[in-house]
Amino acid sequence: MKKFLSILIVMLVTGLAVFANDQQEALNFFNSYVSAANSYSPTVATMYSPNAKIIRQVVKPDGTLVNVNTDTATYVKQMRLGQAGAKMRGYKNHYTNVTVTPMGNGAYKISSLRQPSGENYKLKTYMVVKKVNGSWKITEEMMQTKVQTFLRYAK
């Protein structure tokens, strides 16, 4: 019985260490995403799963929220178009209150508050990341925005 309990405890501790490692890896992936995005690196596009769920939650002037969903290919195309102007303006996002929550199945939800350059407000954001074929990918992303032009893509 002692041997069984010892083996069980070792397995539990090992499992927790692997879990903590993956959670830290997910956070490291998020930090590398922020760094790549703020330096306008083309690698940002490769950080998304080809079928990621992309949500832009538009905060209307009256405070109501409208979700605008898009596919990964369209989002990456829009992102590449916007990068040149953002780079010229020195636009960057600053993230605070970053938390990593396990969702099961190897997926982690990384939630944070995003403060755009030159603004004094913070907006909610989250991404769900998962290891796919050995590398971390964004499988879902929700980012609040006050940019009203996204509303024309709402369905």
Model regions and ranges:
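Positively charged n-region of N-terminal signal peptides that target proteins for export
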Residues: 1-4
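Sec-dependent N-terminal signal peptides
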Residues: 6-10
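Short, low-complexity N-terminal intrinsically disordered segments enriched in polar/charged residues
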Residues: 12, 16-46
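Terminal "cap-and-tail" regions of soluble proteins that handle hydrophobic small molecules
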Residues: 23-32, 68-70, 76-87, 102, ...
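Short, well-ordered alpha-helical segments enriched in acidic and aromatic residues
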Residues: 40-58
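A short gly/proline-enriched turn/hairpin at secondary-structure junctions
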Residues: 53-69
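Surface-exposed, charged secondary-structure patches
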Residues: 69-120
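Short beta-strand edge/turn micro-motifs at domain boundaries
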Residues: 97-101, 107-111, 118-155
